[in-house]
């Protein structure tokens, strides 16, 4: 098991429970996802960490909300499996003041535990940020979790090689947890020159938070757009047709909403034309900072 991931997960968990909060563990998990998606380039990671550690609570929470809003726009196909996280930030239940402070502390704890070292381009495909973190949060802390972890990364890597998953047109995982075996299969594909975007990833678990974590991991691991995730008991439910229908309906609604937004933007632009900008007087505009770049 990756020691750096365990340290980060323990830091997040200790910070959350240190604020005497026992419920709504979707908040620290979704906050971790939103920050992890930022994934600055190696040369920018120290500066990004320092900058984000300087953010106050309102700035941090605003950034997390903006990340989940962007996720909903860019990946409506994952909106249903990610619903616990999306609703945590964009739903009707506001965070309490204690929860807001706890989320801010969680983000700072993850950053101090070198979160961005785990999301660099040469590292992000080899780790699962959520398996250990979810286990510890569900157990109530590191001292209570025992050995109830999801499949460790090195075991998943071995299983992927044994199962020979690199030549499949689709990969099905009927008890996926946070997606460790999918990560291993995708990493093995890359090692052998195959693009994981060419595969359909089909995964289900009975735990809705594990599936929400996997939806976040789809972005971190860059699994592409052929992804079908579901929350169901595979022993009693025929979940795939239902999941395909829900995904299609959500994408349709998202496309209609996007078209409506563009029409509204066009109407506003016609009613309030933007004046022509004055000629620049001091050279080229500054390049965007790492924090201003698209994260997903």
Residue ranges and their predicted role:
Residues 1, 118-122, 148, 203:
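Generic alpha-helical structural element
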Residues 25-32, 127, 131, 153, ...:
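Non-catalytic, well-ordered alpha-helical scaffold segments
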Residues 43-139:
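Long recognition/docking surfaces used for binding and targeting
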Residues 211, 216-296:
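S-adenosylmethionine
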């Amino acid at each position: 098991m990756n020691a750096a991931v365990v340290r980060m997960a323990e830091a997040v968990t200790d910070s959350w429970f240190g604020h005497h909060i026992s419920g709504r563990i979707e908040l620290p998990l979704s906050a971790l996802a939103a920050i992890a998606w930022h994934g600055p380039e190696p040369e920018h990671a120290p500066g990004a960490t320092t900058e984000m550690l300087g953010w106050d609570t309102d700035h941090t929470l605003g950034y997390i909300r903006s990340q989940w809003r962007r996720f909903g726009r860019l990946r409506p196909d994952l909106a249903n499996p990610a619903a616990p996280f999306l609703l945590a930030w964009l739903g009707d239940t506001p965070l309490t003041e204690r929860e807001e402070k706890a989320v801010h502390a969680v983000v700072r704890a993850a950053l101090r535990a070198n979160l961005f070292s785990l999301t660099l381009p040469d590292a992000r495909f080899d780790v699962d940020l959520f398996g250990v973190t979810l286990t510890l949060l569900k157990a109530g802390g590191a001292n209570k979790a025992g050995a109830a972890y999801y499949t460790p990364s090195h075991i998943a890597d071995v299983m992927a090689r044994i199962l020979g998953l690199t030549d499949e047109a689709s990969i099905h995982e009927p008890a996926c947890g946070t997606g460790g075996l999918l990560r291993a299969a995708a990493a093995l594909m890359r090692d052998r020159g195959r693009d994981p975007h060419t595969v359909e990833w089909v995964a289900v678990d009975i735990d809705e938070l594990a599936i929400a974590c996997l939806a976040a991991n789809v972005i971190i691991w860059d699994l592409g757009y052929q992804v079908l995730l579901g929350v169901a008991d595979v022993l009693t439910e025929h979940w795939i047709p239902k999941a395909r229908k829900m995904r299609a309906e959500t994408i349709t609604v998202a496309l209609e909403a996007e078209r409506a937004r563009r029409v509204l933007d066009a109407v506003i632009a016609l009613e309030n034309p933007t004046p022509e900008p004055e000629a620049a007087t001091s050279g080229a505009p500054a390049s965007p900072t790492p924090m201003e770049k698209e994260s997903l």
